[in-house]
Regions:
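Active-site rim/loop-helix segments in enzyme catalytic domains that contact anionic ligands
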Residues: 1-95, 235-237
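Metal-dependent de-N-acetylase/amidase catalytic core
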Residues: 1-5, 80-238
Length: 238
């Protein structure tokens, strides 16, 4: 159904961490779908309903084929929850991606690492023939992504690969700002958060510059591989 499925624990995780890469892949002709694991109901700013509206607006800006929500519990999702893992595996079988991009394996917010674990478990069991997963009463055929990548979030992690997003930094900032409730607003009466400061967008740009330096480009997004990557031609690396 799609070439790439991006998974985020919360609405805005995807946009903050890998939207430049998604813009780039869409321009190359690849199809992209989005899966949020929860509605962000424990978030400090905004409401779950508003965040869903913002998420849908962001998906439209990005050009995603769909945006689904698994409606897991914000703050309490974990890979030991069979139902949660099977639910995400069901979405993977529906989408049939060859590439899944998911949360950082460790980060400031505990949900991010747990979402990474859920994605890893779900990618595996989605390919098990003996596991019957249904959607709207119909069994879904097994489907296992070929590649699982983890994007990098609040905490700095050393990337295994970096994608050059120099052409798409402005689009990344635009799609991030679709989540208006979460970021700086001088008229807001809601509490401050780590991402609502006036200089946060500058910090986001600085992070992209840092990862860009790894491969000699202006701006980049870093990713961690779930397993060693195989290549056909070392001369094509840059």
């Amino acid at each position: 159904m799609v070439d790439i499925l991006a998974i985020g624990a919360h609405p805005d995780d995807i946009e903050l961490s890998c939207s430049g890469t998604l813009f780039k892949q869409i321009k190359k002709g690849y199809s992209v779908g989005l899966l949020d694991l929860c509605r962000g109901e424990l978030g400090t700013r905004g409401t779950p309903e508003l965040r869903i509206q913002e998420a849908n607006a962001a998906a439209e800006i990005l050009g995603a084929g769909f945006r689904w929500n698994a409606e897991l519990q914000d703050g309490f999702m974990n890979a030991f929850d069979r139902d949660a893992v099977c639910q995400v595996a069901t979405f993977i079988r529906r989408a049939k991606p060859s590439v899944v991009i998911a949360n950082a394996p460790e980060d400031r917010h505990p949900d991010h690492g747990r979402a990474a674990d859920i994605a890893r478990e779900a990618c595996f069991i989605a390919g098990l023939k003996a596991l019957d997963l249904k959607w709207e009463g119909k069994s879904l055929a097994p489907s296992r992504p070929h590649i699982l990548l983890h994007y990098i979030q609040d905490r700095h992690l050393v990337p295994d690969i970096v994608v050059d997003i120099s052409e798409f930094l402005d689009k990344k900032i635009e799609v991030v700002k679709a989540f208006k409730s979460q970021f700086y607003d001088p008229d807001s009466t809601e509490p401050e958060t780590p991402i609502s400061s006036k200089d946060f967008m500058d910090q986001l740009t600085g992070k992209a510059q840092t990862y860009g330096r790894y491969c000699g480009v202006a701006y980049g997004e870093g990713f961690i591989l779930n397993r060693p990557a195989g290549i056909d031609n070392i001369n094509e690396l840059f």
